[in-house]
């Protein structure tokens, strides 16, 4: 059993409240999936930049100074915003492959959750209300988002098993049930 929520805002005046609206939806859906949760938010585009949303099992160790290390490695300015176990690196599209290689060399335990101009994927193990609070979802803005509450039935409960899954640049997937059926 899992729960899926989604919201596409047609009224731009509501964009600052997207996180607040999705938070309430995720918490309401908690009984459908209490072991892990995730959210994909679309918004906060930066001109000429891509966002790489990263996850780390040891964020204090992995994220401390990461933007400076990647900047030194690439010779270009890279900035980062951190949210609990996740961080968003802002890079130019020309640097994407170089930055991904640098991340593998510098911090091999970091996992790439999503890449795109608009998407940010946040997901973790725990009750959906706790996941929403950890990432301060209620403070996030955007144009649309999709969330998933999970109760694992055929696989282990871990961060990588939580949804959404990145399927390409600015794309993600959530599903309810076994894809093998």
Q: Where are each of the predicted segments found?
A:
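N-terminal segments that mediate ammonia production and transfer
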Residues: 1-181
């Amino acid at each position: 059993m899992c729960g899926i929520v989604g919201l596409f805002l047609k009224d731009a005046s509501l964009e600052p409240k997207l996180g607040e609206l999705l938070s309430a939806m995720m918490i309401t859906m908690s009984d459908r999936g209490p072991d892990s949760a995730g959210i994909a938010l679309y918004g906060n585009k930066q001109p000429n930049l891509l966002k790489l949303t990263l996850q780390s099992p040891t964020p204090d160790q992995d994220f401390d100074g990461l933007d400076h290390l990647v900047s030194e490695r690439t010779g270009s300015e890279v900035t980062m915003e951190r949210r609990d176990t996740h961080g968003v690196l802002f890079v130019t599209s020309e640097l994407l492959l170089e930055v991904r290689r640098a991340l593998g060399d510098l911090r091999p335990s970091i996992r790439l959750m999503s890449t795109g101009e608009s998407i940010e994927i946040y997901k973790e193990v725990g009750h959906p209300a706790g996941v929403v609070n950890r990432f301060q979802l209620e403070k996030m803005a955007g144009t649309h988002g999709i969330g998933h509450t999970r109760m694992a039935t055929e696989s282990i409960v871990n961060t990588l098993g939580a949804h959404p899954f990145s399927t390409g640049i600015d794309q993600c997937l959530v599903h309810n049930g076994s894809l093998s059926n």
